[in-house]
Amino acid sequence: MNKLNTAKRAQVVSAIVEGCSIRSIVRMTGVSKNTVAKLLVELGAACSKYMDEHLTGLNCQRVQVDEIWAFIGCKQKAVTVEKLEKGVCGDVWTWIAIDADTKLVPCFMIGQRDPITARDFMEDLAGRLANRVQLTSDGLKCYLNAVKTAFGNDIDYAMLIKIYGNNPEGQKRYSPAECTGCKRKRIKGNPDPEHISTSYIERQNLTVRMSLRRFTRLTNAFSKKVENHVAALSVFYMYYNFVRIHQTLRVTPAMAAGVSDRLWAIEDIIGLLH
C-alpha cells in the first residue's frame, strides 16, 4: 500500500463506496487484492476515529433509527463450531441513525439484533446530541429499554409499527411480506405525529445496499472478515457525510449539520491516514 500514490488510492476508495467488489477493484485498477484490503482496513480505522471525535454536540431535531441485515463468512444456518473458532461468522446487523433534516448519519454500530447492542447504540447516539430530539424507530422491542436507559425522560419517542399481510400458503419470498398498514405509537414525551416516520432511514438502508457491494442481497458478495465489514462501513459513512452531495440539500450532510464548512474530496479522506 505504501507504493500507491494518492491518485491511485482515491481511485480504489471511489470504487469501494460506489458499489464495487474487492475483486472488481483489482481488475479495474491493477492494485493487488491484499493491498486493496489493507488500504480499506487502515483507512476505515482512520475514518472511524475522525467521525467519533467530530460527530458530537449535534443540534439534531428529528432522528430516525433502524437496523440492516448482512452476514459475515456464511449465513447463520451454515455456521459451525469450526467456523466460529476461526472468527466471527453468521448474521450481523448494522444499527444506523439518521438526522431527518440534514441527512447526517451521526453514528452506526455493528452487532447482533439484541438488547445489548440496542443499548450500546442508543447510548452512543445520546452522547452525540446537544439537545432533546424526536426519535422514531420501528417496532423492535429492544428499543424500549435501550431508549429509556440512554435518554431517560429527555426524549420524544415514538414507534412506527408496520402491519404485514400473510404470505400465500406454500409461497416463498425473498422480501418481507406486503405491508398493509402502519400504526404510530407514542412511547415517551410528546412526539409530533406528523414526523413519526422511518422513511429517511429506510431510504438510507437502500443507499447502503446500493453503495457497498458486501450488502447487496442475493449475490455471493459478502464480508469474509468482521474487520473488513466494519472498515467498509466506516469509509462509506465518512464519504457519505463529508464528500457526497445530497441531491435535495445540494450540500453534504456534514455541511448541512454544521459539522464541516467545506466540501471534502476523497483525497481529503485519504489524508486522514497521515
What residue spans do the PLM features occupy?
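Residue-level recognition of single "structural anchor" positions
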Residues: 1-274
